[in-house]
Amino acid sequence: MKAMILAAGKGTRVRPITHTIPKPMIPILQKPVMEFLLELLRQHGFDQIMVNVSHLAEEIESYFRDGQRFGVQIAYSFEGNIVDGDLVGKALGSAGGLKKIQEFNPFFDDTFVVLCGDALIDLDLTTAVKLHREKGAIATIITKTVPQELVSSYGVVVTDDNGKILTFQEKPAVEEALSTEINTGIYIFEPEVIDYIPSGQEYDLGGDLFPKLVDSGLPFYAVNMDFEWVDIGKVPDYWQAIRGVLSREIKNVQIPGIEVRPGVYTGINVAANWDNIEIEGPVYIGGMTRIEDGVKIIGPSMIGPSCLICQGAVVDNSVIFEYSRLGPGARLVDKLVFGRYCVDKTGAAIDVQAAALDWLITDARHAAVQYRQEYPSQREISKLLQPE
């Protein structure tokens, strides 16, 4: 069976992470989100998978290649051009990407599934396809019910009593929402649906194609299913995903490594004298990381591989990516550290290098950074990283 993973977006709402990592490659405890999707697809018999790529396409292609080591076949559709010797992505939209593939050569010749490349799911795809076919649908959206107070964060789907889609509401105010069913970005299509997508232009599934299907009166349905769905569309979403995995609220992701203390998991060759470290799980620490004496770590927290957490530092409810160095005495509370950026839970970021705060946070591969006199502006910024 055939499927498509949408992986061409720039991921602007997950910046600064997506400056160097495309959204499908964002790691959940060192494993890219898209790898979980491939495992799910393979489990349900989808072994021919098309992936549209654009932003940082080479990162996705070089990791997954032709899919052999994941037990599937993968091919890529690049959206963009070479301009002045540089590869420049230009995404065609979620529907435009489908059209490009089908016009190249009719790949989709039977019922197929489309997944967004930035979500963790454990959906029973076999049952979903069965329900789609039973309804005689040309297109089906998998929906999920959320509490009324959360509908304003999602695209709301409004249906009749038989599940046929009547209209959509994009992030409506709570009091204006006509439904609590939301679009999860999981779709089941018949090949004929691609005939409704125009050629050679940017075209979106939700904003363009779906309203056209409704207006045309086509058999377009929503199927509401109960499953685990963790969207990673924004920095706060990613934060919650990591917390959910560490706290075992997300059941379909296992914590890797070995448990060295209750609730404390590590990769191989972590250098730490646990008797001289105050640590409270759940915590994951990647391999080849050094934790110096006097460090305090409070979970849920994740420290990536090849990091250095210096003496007296505090890591509290935080996520630290690989090759990060947290300086002596630094206090990191409710923060995400990615390269030269320190990000809070709302997504607001500080460029620690531009702020000359590399004595506090830097790349662990640099030579040791010495403490130096701070300027007032630096002191004010550092307070954001070291809340009381």
UniProtKB/Swiss-Prot annotation:
Its cofactor is Mg(2+). Catalyzes the formation of UDP-glucose, from UTP and glucose 1-phosphate. Is highly specific since it cannot use other NTPs such as dTTP, CTP, ATP, and GTP, and other sugar-1P such as GlcNAc-1P, Gal-1P, and Man-1P, as substrates. Has probably a central and essential role as the substrate supplier for galactolipid synthesis; galactolipids are major constituents of the photosynthetic thylakoid membrane and important for photosynthetic activity. GO terms for molecular function: magnesium ion binding; nucleotidyltransferase activity; UTP binding; UTP:glucose-1-phosphate uridylyltransferase activity. It comes from Synechocystis sp. (strain ATCC 27184 / PCC 6803 / Kazusa). Belongs to the CugP-type UDP-glucose pyrophosphorylase family. This is UTP--glucose-1-phosphate uridylyltransferase. Mg(2+) binds at D118. One of its GO terms (biological process) is UDP-alpha-D-glucose metabolic process. Pfam families: NTP_transferase. PANTHER family: SUGAR-1-PHOSPHATE GUANYL TRANSFERASE. It catalyses: alpha-D-glucose 1-phosphate + UTP + H(+) = UDP-alpha-D-glucose + diphosphate. The CugP-type UDP-Glc PPase appears to be present in all cyanobacteria, whereas the GalU-type UDP-Glc PPase is present in only certain cyanobacterial species. Moreover, the GalU-type PPase is found to be widely distributed throughout the bacterial kingdom, whereas the CugP-type can be found in only very limited species other than cyanobacteria. Disruption phenotype: Complete disruption of this gene could not be achieved, suggesting that the CugP-type UDP-Glc PPase is essential for growth and survival of Synechocystis. The keyword Hydrolase does not apply. GO terms for cellular component: cytoplasm.
